[in-house]
Amino acid sequence: MRQLFVLDPLQCIQPAKDSSAALMQAAQRASIEVWACTPADLQARGDQLSAIAVPVVAEPWISTGEPRSLPLTDFACIWMRKDPPVDEGYLYATHLLELAERAGVCVLNRPAALRAWNEKLGALRFNNLMAPTLVASRVSELAAFAREQEEVVLKPLGGRAGQGLVRVAGAAPGLEALLELVTDQEQLPVMVQRFLPAVIEGDKRILLVDGEPLGAVNRRPKAGDFRSNLAMGGRPEPTELDSRELQICAELAPVLREQGLFFVGIDVIDGLLSEINVTSPTGIREVERLKGVPLADQVIARLLVSLG
């Protein structure tokens, strides 16, 4: 069996931290032939879909062979693991991968869902599980909401890994000017969400496979910051899921399955859903290190069962 990973250039990956590296290594341990390419390596000539890909020896990390042009139908599964931003190149790649899916190839996550699920806006499908939230472009509406909530977090809809998050008081001087900046003079919507003080104790990244939680890690912000993302200096800690968090997972599960979102990372703060990460969820390495479980192997095993 062959699997293809569509992701950032391999030389950019830090194997000790990267979930894609963990998945490739687990696939290799399962006797799967692992190949890799970037979105720019995908192509279609008529109805012939292919990728200029390299064979990967993922463990020990990493060696590659010579690039070859291979039909996408040669792969039992294609993982779309390119990190955001979800820009034009990313979107075009999902269109090509959707053609492969129509040709019978399993593509994870489903390309149409990757286009449809903005990682901030997707959570609004479950707004009953979230903190009070407003998405808007009008400064007057955003400012009124911020004053109502007293303290909020501004979230650019295209941000990732904590980039661009701003904590601000509703009564802060210059609030309107800040909102003008983040909305590009009311040309772009932004998410404004009630600030949850419990985030200082951390948020939970929960990894779901086919709708079921397989692992979780608590991410505690560094001193003086409220952003718990590991890329922003957050510290990973072992954790267990409580009944509320299991309830959130259970409510998401049927929708994630129906949408073809096989591998997803959700963020939960104080029992409230914050984000649903579908592009290239991280956290495998941290769960494996803190809990001593072979999480990546479990993900690949679930995939092999689903492939039959």
Curated annotation (Swiss-Prot):
Pathway entry: Sulfur metabolism; glutathione biosynthesis; glutathione from L-cysteine and L-glutamate: step 2/2
Cofactor(s), by name: Mg(2+); Mn(2+)
Cross-referenced PROSITE patterns: ATP_GRASP
Manganese listed as a keyword: yes
ATP-grasp domain: residues covered: 120-304
GO molecular function terms listed in the Swiss-Prot or TrEMBL record: ATP binding; glutathione synthase activity; metal ion binding
Top-level EC class: ligase
Residue positions binding Mg(2+): E275, N277
Family: Belongs to the prokaryotic GSH synthase family.
PANTHER family reported in the protein's UniProt record: GLUTATHIONE SYNTHETASE (PTHR21621:SF4), RIBOSOMAL PROTEIN S6 MODIFICATION PROTEIN (PTHR21621)
The protein's name: Glutathione synthetase
Biological source species: Prochlorococcus marinus (strain MIT 9313)
